[in-house]
Amino acid sequence: MKIGIYTLGCKVNQYETQAMEQELTARGHELVDFESPADAYIINTCSVTAVSDKKSRQMIRRAKKNSPDAVVAACGCYVQTHEKEAKSLGIDLLMGTNDRARFLDRLEEAVKTRETVADIDDALRRRTFEVLPAGGMANRTRAMLKVEDGCVNFCTYCIIPYARGPVRSLPMDKAAEQVRALRAQGY
């Protein structure tokens, strides 16, 4: 299956996209440029500002317009915090900021069945850290390793606690294991 991915937002989104790309490649899928014809498109959205919300909507609409027969899947903070609005965009698969492995399973299923799926949990109830494979990004000399997710400060201007949930950390043994794996890859 050919899949195009577009990532908006922060280093966390970039890291999570890189982990999804690794898994998709391991599953035998071909990654293509977002503007190229594909069977499915993934938009990893952002919601830190109104501008990022707008860009998320624009990229979803662009994928739908450029390839009406493709499955359009969206994940990330915009989908997590604006579920009703995101559903109105005609997305085939909506999942927020959690459970990337299940997201990819659902994507493969959506391409086969053409059924619309919305699976967004309550971020504020999360208590475990989602362990994703560490790895380098294409054309980068530095690898990223996510060791923490979420926030509990609830600043009046910030949506992150609602998008990402409470603070959760990568267990120390898993962090050490991933650092060793990155070192073995030459980072």
Where does each model-flagged region fall?
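Proteins enriched for Cys/Gly/acidic motifs involved in redox and nucleic-acid/cofactor modification
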Residues: 1-187
